[in-house]
A protein has these predicted regions:
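N-terminal Sec-pathway targeting helices
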Residues: 1-10
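Beta-propeller blade termini and top-face loops
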Residues: 23-716
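Hydrophobic membrane-insertion alpha-helices, especially the h-region
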Residues: 9-20
Length: 716
């Protein structure tokens, strides 16, 4: 007799913080799924989990509602505060998260402020030995740019900008992770408050240009009023009253440029860019007063996407590097490690006279001298569609530093191909299946700043946090990772050893940064990379005999690790003949606790079963597994609509499986370990269509009792 399924319907609140990795495993394995192809998949997966099924949107003001609800719980149940629950941070201490924002105090280079796109604003006053998060827990967690007012007497004033709208950790490149405007610190970075004129109050719905930020900078020359510039979605803005009000000096509110950038010279001259695709106001611009801008766009460049600016420290000269749409745009072709083409451009502009147009400015296209034709595809310049871009000119040497996935330095400003050296990112000569990272550095460059007192010294920020060098120069640049304690990692999953109570080992699936393992409860214990990619669901076998480790889109391995967490061997075990598009972006898996020898995994709308995982040889074979997988005969049909399996749970003693879908429904499979697996639907008619089943927990003593968690907002 079918019994009514008892439900616990809850709201899952997902907090995001970015992360990556030190290269300390004996070998690294690159997950060869195409990064650009996966962006839409990640976006759809995140949206499915959170949207209100009734409206198809994430509700306005939902973060403030969450905090208010939490305060109500604490008020109504004082035991939540008094019962003595103690939470211990487990890190990762040694893994810095994705960082776009970096600023160095002009008075003290040991005072550094930096920001993660979803990790908040952090500060160090001892050069990176210790870090402290200075943004409030209930403040918007995103930070894409930080600037200090450089004028004497005003240097305790700092500004930050939120809102990454390309390549976000929450939803994939090209998707909005909306900000909520700019923030101000009046106490030298110790505390931050929103700038009201830029705050929309609705960071989950796009209502203002200020929600998509690219850069905020302060002019060093205005003696009377603070002069700020912001590059946002669609516009360049200027404020002369510490951000109380803003004037749009470039751009518009319709047919807007998606990408923009702004930079200010020491004499107050302003350079700006607005991307060209579908934009009515677009181009490269220069302004002597920050109000009146002249279009100086070079005639040889026909179209462009994101373009970032690097100014010469003493001359009125600017470099621009960025992504262009095609081979006819004016740039050059390059390829990523999979051979996928993209097009990039590197331009130099020298101001001569007048308003900078015509003979008043000289343009050079130096794109052909970028390192786009190296023998190893990992060594080539790759901006990943404009996700990682930076260019800087080193004071005193005129060396030009550019960044994509890797970091490069050219001693002749890229006037030739002959004088360029890779000084960061991936290890030189990396290939698919055998790759590493440049010693103490990290791929995916977002910015680099030079020391004002010693231009050979520099700080670099990337998807792996913050690095410092005392000698930025061609050749073997020595980097120091100063991200220790800069805890900004984002986890998709955490796996414990369920067969050994209180075991300290944790295996985590990290956003964009693979699967890390740690062996100690100590906060400062080092986490080690196992398999790279977007870390997903994992499993630890009894006595840690083997591990099941997965990355995005169902890419699954069986691995053997030593007692230090190093990967000794591995093999791929996801089924052959299944296209990656069928999987959830972060695809669940479960091992039957009855014998620990059967792996279950959703394959889109079907459930797969792999028997005999204990005896499956770990032989280094990285081809998908043939023949051994079995699947449910019937496709899951939920509420008369084809649905995907989003989660599953296996009972502790009866081989019973429950699966949930992205369209509210839950199914039960009896005796799933043998014969055909038949799904029996359980009643969920009281729930709205579209509810995302995030997790299921089975009562260990009675498999007729389960808890089901829906992660969507407003499902109750």
């Amino acid at each position: 007799m079918q019994k009514m399924l008892p439900f616990l319907i809850g709201l899952v609140l997902c907090a995001n913080a970015a992360v990556f990795v030190s290269g300390d495993a004996p070998f690294h394995e690159e997950n060869n799924e195409g990064a650009l192809d996966e962006l839409a998949g990640r976006q759809a997966w995140e949206w499915q989990q959170l949207h209100d099924p009734a409206t198809g949107k994430i509700p306005d003001f939902v973060r403030s509602q969450e905090l208010a609800f939490l305060r109500t719980l604490q008020k109504n149940d004082p035991s939540l505060k008094s019962r003595g629950d103690v939470w211990q941070s487990r890190g990762p201490w040694n893994v810095g998260g994705r960082t776009r924002a970096l600023a160095i105090d002009v008075r003290d280079e040991n005072h550094i402020l930096t920001g993660g796109v979803s990790g908040g604003i952090w500060q160090t006053r001892d050069g990176g030995t210790t870090w402290k998060k200075v943004s409030l827990p209930d403040a918007h967690p995103g930070c894409v740019s930080i600037t200090q007012d450089p004028r004497p007497g005003k240097q305790n004033m700092w500004y930050a900008l939120s809102g990454e709208i390309y390549g976000t950790s929450a939803s994939g490149g090209g998707a909005f992770y909306l900000g909520d405007g700019a923030f101000l610190s009046l106490d030298n970075g110790d505390s931050w408050t929103p700038i009201a004129s830029t705050a929309s109050g609705t960071p989950n719905q796009f209502t203002s240009n200020f929600q998509g930020g690219w850069r905020i900078v302060a002019s060093p020359v205005d003696t009377v009023a603070t002069c700020l510039y912001m590059a946002t979605y669609g516009a360049i803005w200027r404020s002369t009253d510490t951000g109380k009000s803003w004037a749009m000096v470039l751009g518009n509110n319709s047919n807007s440029a998606y990408f923009s950038d702004v930079a200010v010279r020491p004499n107050g001259v302003v350079y700006a860019t607005l991307s060209s695709t579908n934009a009515s106001v677009k181009g490269f611009f220069r302004s002597a007063d920050g109000v009146n801008f002249t279009d100086i766009t070079p005639s040889f460049l026909r179209s462009w996407e994101r373009m970032v600016i690097g100014l010469h420290p003493t001359r009125d000269e600017a470099f621009f590097i960025g992504e262009v749409p095609s081979d006819t745009s004016g740039g050059v072709v390059t390829t990523n490690y999979e051979g996928t083409k993209e097009y990039v451009a590197l331009l130099r502009y020298q101001y001569v006279s007048g308003n900078g147009t015509g003979n008043g400015g000289v343009w050079e296209n130096r794109s052909s001298n970028l390192p786009t034709d190296a023998a190893s595809s990992f060594d080539r310049y790759n901006s990943q569609g404009g996700y990682n871009l930076m260019v800087r000119v080193q004071p005193g040497t005129d060396y030009v530093v550019t960044g994509g996935t890797n970091l490069y330095i050219s001693t002749d400003g890229f006037t030739s191909k002959n004088n360029t050296t890779q000084i960061g990112g991936y290890s030189l000569g990396s290939t698919i299946g055998s790759w590493g990272v440049y010693m103490n550095h990290h791929p995916d460059q977002h910015d680099l700043l030079f020391s004002a007192s010693n231009p050979m010294q520099a700080w670099s920020v990337s998807d792996g946090g913050i690095r410092k060098t005392k000698a930025l120069k061609p050749g073997n640049t020595v980097w120091e990772d100063i991200s220790y304690g800069y805890i900004t990692s984002q986890f998709y999953s955490v796996t414990i050893n369920k067969n050994k109570p209180f075991d300290a080992w944790l295996l985590g699936g990290l956003q964009d940064n693979g699967n890390y393992i740690v062996r100690s409860r100590q906060l400062k214990a080092g986490w080690k990379m196992t398999i790279n990619g977007d870390g997903a669901y994992n499993y630890i076998a009894p006595n840690r005999e083997f591990y099941i480790i997965s990355t995005q889109l169902g890419n699954t391995r069986k691995a053997i690790l030593d007692e230090q967490g190093n990967v000794l061997s591995r093999r791929r075990i996801d089924p052959d003949g299944v296209d990656k598009s069928v999987y959830n972006f972060i695809n669940p898996l479960a091992v039957d606790p009855n014998g620990e020898d059967i792996l279950y995994m959703p394959i889109g709308p079907r459930l797969g079963r792999l028997k005999g995982i204990k005896s499956l040889p770990v032989n280094g074979d990285m081809n998908k597994l043939k023949d051994r997988w079995e699947f449910t005969d019937s496709v899951v049909v939920s509420s008369n609509v084809a649905a995907e399996i989003t989660t599953l749970a296996v009972s502790a003693n009866s081989h019973t499986i429950y699966v949930g879908t992205n369209n509210r429904d839950v199914f039960r499979i009896n005796n799933a370990h043998e014969g055909k697996m038949t799904m029996t639907p359980l009643s969920t008619f009281r729930l709205p269509s579209g509810g995302f089943v995030n997790s299921i927990t089975i009562d260990p003593d009675d498999d007729n009792k389960v808890f089901v968690c829906y992660s969507n907002y407003n499902v109750n």
